[in-house]
Amino acid sequence: MEHWGEPIPRTGQSWRQPLSTSGRGWLGSAPWRWLGPASWRWLGPASWRWLGSAPWWWLGTATWWWRLGSRWYPRSMEQTQ
């Protein structure tokens, strides 16, 4: 864990190889461990429901605000002119 404080290796220094191997191993393993069996429970039916509902809810609110804005904003622009 001592390589965390080191800068990104750009020169051929002595700590470059352990940093790159451990860093690559950590970067290679951690996301897959994070996306592994433990998070399949997180990516299970509950989150598929969330992934199915949240974007549509966001798009629904965005289109609702856009309709509200497009309905009232041009009317106010016509009044100002």
Swiss-Prot record:
Record has Nucleus as a keyword: no
Residue stretches of biased makeup (Polar residues): 11-22
Main subcellular location: mitochondrion
Annotated membrane topology: Single-pass membrane protein
Region Disordered: start-end pairs: 1-22
Location of this chain's protein in the cell: Mitochondrion outer membrane
Transmembrane intervals: 50-66
GO (cellular component) term, any one: mitochondrial outer membrane
Alphabetically ordered keywords of this record: Membrane, Mitochondrion, Mitochondrion outer membrane, Transmembrane, Transmembrane helix
Additional facts recorded: This protein is produced by a bicistronic gene which also produces the major prion protein/PRNP from an overlapping reading frame. The alternative prion protein and PRNP (AC P10279) have no apparent direct functional relation since a mutation that removes the start codon of the AltPrP has no apparent effect on the biology of PRNP. In mouse and hamster, the alternative initiation AUG codon is absent and is replaced by a GUG codon.
UniProt protein name: Alternative prion protein
